[in-house]
Amino acid sequence: MVSTPQFLVFLLFWIPASRGDILLTQSPAILSVSPGERVSFSCRASQSIGTSIHWYQQRTNGSPRLLIKYASESISGIPSRFSGSGSGTDFTLSINSVESEDIADYYCQQSNSWP
Protein backbone atom coordinates (compact mmCIF):
# COMPACT_ATOMS: atom_id res chain seq x y z
CA MET A 1 0.00 0.00 0.00
CA VAL A 2 1.37 3.40 -0.97
CA SER A 3 0.72 6.22 1.47
CA THR A 4 0.52 9.88 0.57
CA PRO A 5 3.51 11.77 1.98
CA GLN A 6 2.61 14.27 4.63
CA PHE A 7 4.55 17.17 6.00
CA LEU A 8 4.24 19.84 8.62
CA VAL A 9 3.82 23.55 8.19
CA PHE A 10 4.75 25.48 11.31
CA LEU A 11 3.61 28.94 12.28
CA LEU A 12 5.70 31.38 14.24
CA PHE A 13 3.93 33.73 16.65
CA TRP A 14 4.70 37.42 16.74
CA ILE A 15 3.49 38.80 20.05
CA PRO A 16 4.68 42.27 21.09
CA ALA A 17 5.22 42.58 24.83
CA SER A 18 5.00 46.32 25.41
CA ARG A 19 1.84 47.91 26.77
CA GLY A 20 -0.15 49.66 24.05
CA ASP A 21 1.35 47.64 21.21
CA ILE A 22 -0.83 45.90 18.67
CA LEU A 23 -1.03 42.21 19.53
CA LEU A 24 -1.06 39.74 16.63
CA THR A 25 -2.28 36.20 17.20
CA GLN A 26 -1.77 33.50 14.58
CA SER A 27 -3.51 30.15 14.21
CA PRO A 28 -3.16 27.26 13.86
CA ALA A 29 0.19 26.82 15.59
CA ILE A 30 1.04 23.59 13.75
CA LEU A 31 -0.61 22.20 10.65
CA SER A 32 -0.13 18.87 8.90
CA VAL A 33 -1.25 18.69 5.27
CA SER A 34 -0.78 16.60 2.15
CA PRO A 35 0.63 17.95 -1.11
CA GLY A 36 -2.08 19.41 -3.30
CA GLU A 37 -4.30 20.52 -0.43
CA ARG A 38 -5.35 24.11 0.23
CA VAL A 39 -4.31 25.60 3.57
CA SER A 40 -5.26 28.82 5.30
CA PHE A 41 -3.57 30.60 8.19
CA SER A 42 -5.24 33.24 10.34
CA CYS A 43 -3.76 36.39 11.84
CA ARG A 44 -5.88 38.46 14.22
CA ALA A 45 -4.92 41.96 15.40
CA SER A 46 -5.95 43.28 18.81
CA GLN A 47 -7.19 46.49 17.17
CA SER A 48 -8.07 47.62 13.67
CA ILE A 49 -5.02 48.11 11.44
CA GLY A 50 -6.71 48.57 8.06
CA THR A 51 -4.74 46.47 5.59
CA SER A 52 -1.33 47.02 7.21
CA ILE A 53 -0.48 43.33 7.50
CA HIS A 54 2.33 41.50 5.70
CA TRP A 55 2.95 37.76 5.44
CA TYR A 56 6.38 36.10 5.49
CA GLN A 57 7.74 32.62 4.89
CA GLN A 58 10.92 31.43 6.60
CA ARG A 59 12.45 28.08 5.72
CA THR A 60 14.85 26.32 8.10
CA ASN A 61 18.16 28.23 8.22
CA GLY A 62 16.81 30.74 5.70
CA SER A 63 15.95 34.42 5.74
CA PRO A 64 12.35 35.64 5.92
CA ARG A 65 10.77 36.08 2.50
CA LEU A 66 7.90 38.51 1.94
CA LEU A 67 4.95 36.70 0.36
CA ILE A 68 2.09 39.21 0.57
CA LYS A 69 2.08 42.90 1.49
CA TYR A 70 -0.79 45.06 2.71
CA ALA A 71 -3.08 42.08 3.32
CA SER A 72 -3.61 41.07 -0.32
CA GLU A 73 -0.97 42.60 -2.61
CA SER A 74 1.12 39.99 -4.42
CA ILE A 75 4.90 40.20 -4.61
CA SER A 76 6.86 39.77 -7.83
CA GLY A 77 8.46 36.33 -8.01
CA ILE A 78 6.14 34.73 -5.46
CA PRO A 79 4.07 31.84 -6.87
CA SER A 80 0.41 32.66 -7.49
CA ARG A 81 -0.68 29.84 -5.16
CA PHE A 82 -0.03 32.27 -2.27
CA SER A 83 -2.81 34.78 -1.62
CA GLY A 84 -3.91 37.04 1.20
CA SER A 85 -7.16 38.63 2.30
CA GLY A 86 -8.72 40.58 5.13
CA SER A 87 -8.86 44.03 6.68
CA GLY A 88 -9.42 45.59 10.07
CA THR A 89 -8.56 42.88 12.58
CA ASP A 90 -8.89 39.57 10.69
CA PHE A 91 -6.47 38.42 8.00
CA THR A 92 -5.84 35.18 6.11
CA LEU A 93 -2.92 33.74 4.18
CA SER A 94 -3.93 30.93 1.82
CA ILE A 95 -1.82 28.48 -0.14
CA ASN A 96 -3.61 26.73 -2.98
CA SER A 97 -2.26 23.31 -3.89
CA VAL A 98 0.52 23.09 -1.30
CA GLU A 99 3.89 21.81 -2.53
CA SER A 100 6.69 20.16 -0.56
CA GLU A 101 8.83 23.29 -0.97
CA ASP A 102 6.25 25.16 1.14
CA ILE A 103 7.48 23.49 4.35
CA ALA A 104 8.36 26.53 6.45
CA ASP A 105 7.39 28.88 9.25
CA TYR A 106 4.80 31.49 8.26
CA TYR A 107 4.17 34.67 10.16
CA CYS A 108 2.36 37.97 9.92
CA GLN A 109 3.75 41.42 10.69
CA GLN A 110 1.85 44.67 11.08
CA SER A 111 3.09 48.07 9.93
CA ASN A 112 0.28 50.22 11.32
CA SER A 113 2.29 51.26 14.39
CA TRP A 114 5.84 50.73 15.62
CA PRO A 115 7.15 50.51 19.20
UniProtKB/Swiss-Prot annotation:
User: Hey, what's the signal peptide range on this chain?
Assistant: 1-20
Stretches for region Framework-1: 21-43
Q: Does the keyword Disulfide bond apply?
A: yes
Region described as Complementarity-determining-3: 109-115
Q: Which InterPro entries match?
A: Ig-like_dom (IPR007110), Ig-like_dom_sf (IPR036179), Ig-like_fold (IPR013783), Ig_sub (IPR003599), Ig_sub2 (IPR003598), Ig_V-set (IPR013106), IgV_Light_Chain (IPR050150)
Q: State any GO CC term.
A: immunoglobulin complex
Keywords of the record: Adaptive immunity, Disulfide bond, Immunity, Immunoglobulin, Signal
Q: Which Cys pairs are S-S linked?
A: 43-108
> Does the record's keyword annotation contain Signal?
yes
| Location of region: Framework-3 | 77-108
Provide an example Pfam family for this protein.
V-set
Which residues lie within the region annotated Complementarity-determining-2?
Answer: 70-76
**GO process terms (BP):** adaptive immune response
Region Complementarity-determining-1, annotated ranges: 44-54
- Show the segment(s) annotated as Framework-2: 55-69
In the UniProt entry for this protein, what further remark is given in the free-text comments? Answer: There appears to be two possible splice junctions at the 3' end of the intron. The alternate would code for a protein lacking residues 17-19.
Q: Matching PANTHER family, A to Z?
A: IMMUNOGLOBULIN LIGHT CHAIN
Q: What is this protein called?
A: Immunoglobulin kappa variable 5-48
- State the organism of origin: Mus musculus (Mouse)
Kindly list the organism's lineage. Eukaryota, Metazoa, Chordata, Craniata, Vertebrata
Q: Which gene encodes it?
A: Igkv5-48
